């Protein structure tokens, strides 16, 4: 503010001076020798007194007087009185030609106010304790808990040692908090909200913020968050930090030690050796990477400590990407041995299954040698390497299924009217699931149970409850159920159970459903109210099953049911697909198969 | 009896050695022994090669890919070693195995060898041995085997009976609809080649359905390969069928949703134009082309821009000028400000090629503004390309008219920070000199050329000494004495030995464009001085220079002028100097 008005003052002064130029030049100026001093107002040059002082003392006296202070006066020394008068007339113009300074790129003003010490202490407490709820509450109320918008760096949570939130959380071993912080500060929407600017602006800042979080040494021992995690044996934190390629593992602290050097130094548990080993693996471990060129189908194995960059050889071929990773291995030799056995094993499988053959072989080998295994699943829409055997990997899958189901729900709402009209034309490809079609008492019973008011009401409900019998679209199953009259009823109901919520053993409803006002389960099991419209059965890549479903199922089927039961939609998916025989599943064609695409086009 | 046994043992020896070597741990040893395979076969004779060596190779085919690759290649040339066409089929089994391995390079080599030996088969043995193998490959469980099969149809088809022909057709059609994209890709790549060996009348019935299948494939990598196949079909079919069956497919590919496919279309644009051009509505084709020029993907615009001139040249003459001025140039004007530098560079390289096609008047009114705009572009590569097409402008309007606007651009490039850019403009100088005339050159460009002689990058100094020769040839020796020799004299006295060496290099090239009198008068005094330079590098380069310059002198002058200098250098304290002076003496016969 001060600077702006000063500039304005200068301009005004120039105008003033110009209009009075002749008068000024005629005014006799006291020509005294020696230095003179003037006092002037920083804020408004026009308010400045036009007095000349002979000594510092005199001018200082004025500046310190009440009048001087009221205009926040400064003083300046000049060689001659004329220079002093000129200064008062046009500011600094005669000595240094004063132009309007180039407009510095204006920094955006964050819509959020700064965080004070007390608030920061509260924040620190939550980070330390791993109190995710309160952590998120604070960050949501003011993102500046995380980012210092002044320099696009991490906010300092603890003065003195200048710890940022990662330092604190790493020391305390709060893995989840760290993962959340890293996720937030790399989230474009979060940053846009924080800065109040656009995506291009924050993308640049993001790099700086991330680097500042991961690689800033503290003020005491020059430890980075990775040093802390390693020192205190917080293996989960070490893993999260090293997974981020922006983390510099080679930084040294004041004692000249890298994060690896101080592994477990302050760890006191009995399993110190194990912890040190794990930290070593996470920081220095070797990985075997499987690269795939999706165009030519060629594959390549490499061994390295860091994921290699993706590359493209020509515009007509797609980018070669890492599609799976095994490791970390303790030594490069172990990794090379693994790569070698991966290269030689399973030749048959690798030549039969073109897009998952190598992965299937590698997965088994990794299990045998107890190496960690991650691979990409393209249907998820990202190149992220996932371990579906871990909670984190399953979490990603669960989120995907939830999103997919939500999308299906929306679509079915939108298309409901049109499907009503076209349903009869669609013939066997979309038969309405009416259990009356099936002969046999059992299914009739079920049908009655479901609509206790009788068949009339079932008809009334028709419009709301439309089911598509996807089995007619599973070639093998459809063939059997339609053409094979000897198919037992038990098997039929089983098959239908696989896809409908009328299943005799319905999977527990996913929690978010029970919260949703659309689906009311409160009436309990005894109530025979018409169940809500079931979203069409979800296959991961398409409305109908394809090879991807089989590939995914094979992996999920190996996971302990205990772990999978934490992910209801995934569990649901596994249960449904598990009802089918391996043979049925193996007939599912790749999603881009011409035969499959043709039949879809006809529909 | 014992004699016979002994002979057998002797004959077995090479195989025993081979087996030993093939079991060696060291891959390079195994590679070496596989490379010697033909020698071993020769030693064994045809019968034993067939019965033992080939048998052995078939059984022990599991090795590193490098070894397999060499093996696959060798077997393709084995026909004479197994006893010629009558027995060539014994090579099929090992090659069939190699055609199914995981490594693409090995498979491709095996297919190449199989194609080679297919020609060596008689028709009968082709049906008896080759076709069953092809059948096995094409219907195998492994996608690697099916992929390899695709490449073998075209060598078999022309030589088999109609019954087998129709079987092959249906096999190929099945491969075009394979579940594995890699197989479909191989089929799409070979479709055009296969169509070419068809009887003309049978192409439509036999393969058109496969083309239509492949061009709507889900995988863009498959669709992009059908561009070439469709072009091949186009050249085979008669007008009516081409219009009815091929044109719609190509038109769809122009609008494909994947930019990789559109890129391929742009790459093959001229071939497409040749196939469709004569029968298709020109406006429609031009519209499709301008769409490529406006494509959202930079790579596509680049590829399309590259073909601007050729496309225009191929247009029917009566409509050409109209189309260029009304359609193509309108789009080109947008490309001048394209966000992608590469697109602008391509445009700068081709745009002036349109000048001869549209005549002087249109060039001045339409092309010149584009030219000027590109000349002032921020990217050096763009300016370089546009200056390089100066000769084309010259043909139409005379470059002299442009000299005032060219100069700043040339000077800018001459001082560009990237040495490759400077190098390009250095090499372009002789052409500029001839286009713009001596007067302009002497006044404006010569100072630049002389400056380059002292550039801090060696390549620039070297290139500028080379152009001095061309310039001297163009403007004459007298020109060199007045313009270049003074600079040489200056360099000769430079404190930096590198500059003194540049001086020598320049004299080398100059001497080739000057008369003997001029050499004696202008060049030799400078060399004489440098022979006594303090730095050995300069002295031995002086020896080298004498060798080159001496080639342009008569024997008598050599003896009188050059020999004493070389003898002096021959007594130098530095080994290298003595060496090069000796070399110069020898090559000049002194």
From Swiss-Prot, chain A:
<keyword id="KW-0131">Cell cycle</keyword>
<feature type="repeat" description="ANK 2">
    <location>
        <begin position="221"/>
        <end position="250"/>
    </location>
</feature>
<dbReference type="InterPro" id="IPR036770">
    <property type="entry name" value="Ankyrin_rpt-contain_sf"/>
</dbReference>
<dbReference type="GO" id="GO:0005635">
    <property type="term" value="C:nuclear envelope"/>
</dbReference>
<keyword id="KW-0132">Cell division</keyword>
<comment type="subunit">
    <text>Interacts with baf-1. Interacts with protein phosphatase 2A (PP2A) components.</text>
</comment>
<comment type="function">
    <text>Involved in mitotic nuclear envelope reassembly by promoting dephosphorylation of baf-1 during mitotic exit. Coordinates the control of baf-1 dephosphorylation by inhibiting VRK1 kinase and promoting dephosphorylation of baf-1 by protein phosphatase 2A (PP2A), thereby facilitating nuclear envelope assembly. It is unclear whether it acts as a real PP2A regulatory subunit or whether it is involved in recruitment of the PP2A complex.</text>
</comment>
<feature type="region of interest" description="Disordered">
    <location>
        <begin position="505"/>
        <end position="538"/>
    </location>
</feature>
<dbReference type="GO" id="GO:0004860">
    <property type="term" value="F:protein kinase inhibitor activity"/>
</dbReference>
<dbReference type="GO" id="GO:0051721">
    <property type="term" value="F:protein phosphatase 2A binding"/>
</dbReference>
<keyword id="KW-0677">Repeat</keyword>
<keyword id="KW-0539">Nucleus</keyword>
<feature type="compositionally biased region" description="Acidic residues">
    <location>
        <begin position="456"/>
        <end position="465"/>
    </location>
</feature>
<comment type="similarity">
    <text>Belongs to the ANKLE2 family.</text>
</comment>
<keyword id="KW-1133">Transmembrane helix</keyword>
<dbReference type="InterPro" id="IPR056237">
    <property type="entry name" value="ANKLE2_3rd"/>
</dbReference>
<protein>
    <recommendedName>
        <fullName>Ankyrin repeat and LEM domain-containing protein 2 homolog</fullName>
    </recommendedName>
</protein>
<dbReference type="Pfam" id="PF24567">
    <property type="entry name" value="ANKLE2_3rd"/>
</dbReference>
<dbReference type="GO" id="GO:0042326">
    <property type="term" value="P:negative regulation of phosphorylation"/>
</dbReference>
<feature type="transmembrane region" description="Helical; Signal-anchor for type III membrane protein">
    <location>
        <begin position="2"/>
        <end position="22"/>
    </location>
</feature>
<keyword id="KW-0812">Transmembrane</keyword>
<dbReference type="InterPro" id="IPR002110">
    <property type="entry name" value="Ankyrin_rpt"/>
</dbReference>
Swiss-Prot record, chain B:
<comment type="subunit">
    <text>Part of a complex consisting of a common heterodimeric core enzyme, composed of catalytic subunit let-92 and constant regulatory subunit paa-1, that associates with a variety of regulatory subunits which confer distinct properties to the holoenzyme. Interacts with rsa-1.</text>
</comment>
<feature type="repeat" description="HEAT 6">
    <location>
        <begin position="228"/>
        <end position="266"/>
    </location>
</feature>
<dbReference type="GO" id="GO:0005737">
    <property type="term" value="C:cytoplasm"/>
</dbReference>
<comment type="similarity">
    <text>Belongs to the phosphatase 2A regulatory subunit A family.</text>
</comment>
<dbReference type="GO" id="GO:0017151">
    <property type="term" value="F:DEAD/H-box RNA helicase binding"/>
</dbReference>
<dbReference type="GO" id="GO:0005634">
    <property type="term" value="C:nucleus"/>
</dbReference>
<dbReference type="InterPro" id="IPR000357">
    <property type="entry name" value="HEAT"/>
</dbReference>
<dbReference type="GO" id="GO:0009792">
    <property type="term" value="P:embryo development ending in birth or egg hatching"/>
</dbReference>
<keyword id="KW-0206">Cytoskeleton</keyword>
<feature type="repeat" description="HEAT 12">
    <location>
        <begin position="466"/>
        <end position="504"/>
    </location>
</feature>
<dbReference type="GO" id="GO:0051754">
    <property type="term" value="P:meiotic sister chromatid cohesion, centromeric"/>
</dbReference>
<dbReference type="GO" id="GO:0051225">
    <property type="term" value="P:spindle assembly"/>
</dbReference>
<feature type="repeat" description="HEAT 8">
    <location>
        <begin position="306"/>
        <end position="344"/>
    </location>
</feature>
<dbReference type="GO" id="GO:0000159">
    <property type="term" value="C:protein phosphatase type 2A complex"/>
</dbReference>
<dbReference type="GO" id="GO:0005813">
    <property type="term" value="C:centrosome"/>
</dbReference>
<dbReference type="Pfam" id="PF22646">
    <property type="entry name" value="PPP2R1A-like_HEAT"/>
</dbReference>
<keyword id="KW-0677">Repeat</keyword>
<feature type="repeat" description="HEAT 11">
    <location>
        <begin position="427"/>
        <end position="465"/>
    </location>
</feature>
<dbReference type="InterPro" id="IPR016024">
    <property type="entry name" value="ARM-type_fold"/>
</dbReference>
<feature type="repeat" description="HEAT 2">
    <location>
        <begin position="74"/>
        <end position="111"/>
    </location>
</feature>
<dbReference type="GO" id="GO:0072686">
    <property type="term" value="C:mitotic spindle"/>
</dbReference>
<protein>
    <recommendedName>
        <fullName>Probable serine/threonine-protein phosphatase PP2A regulatory subunit</fullName>
    </recommendedName>
</protein>
